[in-house]
Amino acid sequence: MVELLIFAIVLAIAVLLSDLAHRSVLSTAVLFLVAGFVCGRDLLGFLPLTPESPVVSHLAELALFSVLFTDGMRVGAGDLFHAWNLPGRALLFGLPLTLLATAIFAHAVAGLPWMASFLVGAVLSPTDPVFASAIVARKEIPGRLRHLLNVESGLNDGLALPIVVVLLAMLAGAAVAWGELALELGAGIALGIALPWIAAKIERSRFFAISGPYEPLYAFSLGLLIYTIASLTHANVYLAAFAAGVTVACVSKKLRDDFHRFGETVAELFKLAALLVFGALISPTLLREIPWSGYLFA
């Protein structure tokens, strides 16, 4: 309960400072990260977490799933059709070039092995949706640029994700079972497409009608179904989440619109909780062990 109490206190402070953060360089994400660091086991000791703690992996998985699910919903059928234009160029050229440049920099400056450097590049190269949403909300930014960032930030996580999964498998050290890996990725995509398509068909049938207060919960229950089924069948949870979000946006605009505000809130809560936990894992000892080249790369 101590962990929940700390999260509630930091969340209340972040909400009260959110308007100031929106108008300045302050960041609610940094607030949670710093709070986790201060409350971690090496300082105040209120969050005595280790990388092996079950809450760390579970919360990180749920946070990434919810972010990918909501990110996928940024991209509708029209966006996919027109993605070959500016967003397509940003994805097909900008994303790989950024990945390559980041990997070279990580290898040259931080001294990481090439495989680890490419993993860092794959993780860092997609446009941060939080950064993109801050720009998209500004009316003084040209509409074409706002549309580019909105579509590109929605699609790039899904495109970079298979690269991250493959590199993680290769870095594990054991021989990669490419057939099993392909089956895992393919099953995740298939599940993420099939289940929302069926759910949209059911929702539009004349036998069912969703009342107002329950409208956001249909897509929420769909997300829970995809998460649990993917976990039970060993399909890739994250590709299933992203594919499901894109499919929902393509097959049912109503379902996407009903879920939008609620889904963004849920994803934000999971993301902030994950940042609090991540901050608790950063210790002064760890910071002292990082060489100057690591800070230069960061």
Model-identified regions with their sequence ranges:
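Transmembrane helical cores of multi-pass secondary ion antiporters/exchangers
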Residues: 1-298
